[in-house]
């Protein structure tokens, strides 16, 4: 085998192909370029490849004129990833035509296609005069624009100066590229069970099944959630079976409004009013449709540049924005929200080297909106609760938040029902160095189940501040104060009281009860304080504190919650010390817990280049103490096994004792497996009195036009990987996800309205499989089942030596298989590499435009060729 053909074979086994033409042209061009380098210098405008450098006989070399102008490929249609200014735009079939002597082949892109990628067509002279289906001469019509096809990456790189681009936020993906997905049905199942042997209380068995089903048709998504439970115990006669329907809803996105429509069962957002479940209809903003640079709160930067200048913005010492602006006033409104605070340092660097530096204070609370951004929700329906004592009154709710200049936000909302009316209004402010604050008040008129009417107000404060110098982040301080007459909507939904009869010494009389007789609504909420603080200690330690304190009207009882913890690391050894306290207003005493956890990876004692399986394992120790004398100590190991690390295990053993409970040994062991067809787990735990076996299986089923595909549990948005004929191919960066026997797999999650990269590990392909493309990009809408399709060539890998009139075929001739879509370029000695070939067929060869510059070769291979890594064959082309 010649060196050139060996390189061709190695290149192809790495699956670096394009759809219609092989990348062998790259090596032809490289070889010819090396030969050309030995010649005397020629004018770059008139490159000429002397075929005598390839063969003494000029007839032994095909027409290589296309390489003289830099063409790596002949004109044709190729599937490519389109990148504009280094940002991904789309993956589509693009037709490439012959350009001038300097351009080689050029892409044919229409005005509408360029406009969808952000080109401001009105800013380019003469572009709007072109026909809708005309190919835009991009590099000649747009000054300094470039178009380059990277054959090896199957990528079309476009660059267009910012002056000709529409003003779009960073990370913007045109809605035209959002993929609503395919029509398909889905089912998620999650089954778990346990068997308990209790030496004192007897044996018990429990099982639970959660079924989440759905149907996607176009942009509509239908979802349903149903559960089943089973319980049997020695303490009770018989067993209990229970099916329960949780919810059903239909939803879709409303792209022009950047909103989402929900019909059926849903829930309201809890940003202004308390979140509630409903059955009805809701139209609400979906900020996921916005680019990352437009989500969350960030200040709008205004400045003035003397000339064309570079603007750099830093936050907490990190560059978060960099752009070039024209002379004059400028506005930057697409800064990515980075945390909740941290002042922004803006630097304007002029072309002459002079700089302007100023600081824009920045803090945020959850309700703050960017300047000019509006978020809303409108809900109408009936109240929905799993509490049988609550009714289903109809209600209407609306909320609105709007960002104003100078860091201000106004917001408000209404809740209206027959027995309840509430109105909210609030303001928020980014106060810069002083933090961020929002204040709102809700006025409510309530009619309770005893028909008593109440008016009240509730005032809420939210505050956020970071002290960057000390590493302190006051993530949230919240306080809500409610008057004695304030009730929320849920309080008014309990079944009404019509009175009851009581016996007295004067006989039976009818009495109208007070609401305190049946429902515990007398102790309505009064004040609530919330606090969350994190403190950075050095580079590897973090201290956190969080807590809440709730008081009630009519009682001195309070709810209290408090958590504190210290996370630290020394080299690769991690340990955590934590404390928690919980007190319920209606229960005596309080629950406290102190815990210590230490984890040491075994790689701490292994060489960095060790191949031992123990490099994926860690030793652990944990201690917990309830501060009432009860303590548990556990030590053990945990880690992962198998090539894909999709089998995880944990074994712990120790001692529990003290307090009022029994003392003795305790421990547990668990195994969890994540596979291409689903997940499974099993575990066992024991103490002196109790032994427990628990187990579970979960997964997803996807029914689509190409059949049924099993996978791991499906999230809201998923990707169907389609590689027909390529079984057991691994999806990169996904534990346990591989194609099934037909070449299909389910990527169980994807990020909606964002570019998702789906790649196959070509090292896991069978020897008889080649891929045209190993990477696909998808941009799914919310709830979509999008298809990432890969074209696999399944068949024999063939190295053919072709002759014509007893001579090797000309160097550079194009070879195409009639029975498959495989093609290649003839190297020296008439050799060509083809993949995905059947046992018998014919190939067509072309090396020029003349009548006698093409031929056809028939071939027949023995059956054992299907088991060979590479088959060599000689054939006569006629």
Segments predicted by a language model, with ranges:
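Extracellular beta-sheet/turn segments enriched in Thr/Pro/Gly and aliphatic residues
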Residues: 155-159, 366-369, 774-795, 859-878
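A short, solvent-exposed loop/turn motif at the edges and junctions
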Residues: 118-120, 164, 761-775, 847-860
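A short, solvent-exposed beta-strand micro-motif common in secreted/extracellular proteins
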Residues: 111-116, 345-348, 669, 753-765, ...
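Structural motif
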Residues: 67-70, 83-84, 173-177, 300-308, ...
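Feature captures outer-membrane beta-barrel proteins of Gram-negative bacteria and organelles
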Residues: 178-180, 205-218, 242-255, 392-406, ...
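Post-signal-peptide, soluble extracytosolic/periplasmic N-terminal scaffold domains
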Residues: 2-11, 18-19, 27-297, 626-702
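Transmembrane beta-strand segments that form the barrel wall of outer-membrane beta-barrel proteins
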Residues: 162, 181-199, 220-232, 261-265, ...
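Exposed, low-structure sequence patches enriched in small/polar residues
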Residues: 511-517, 522-818, 823, 827-839
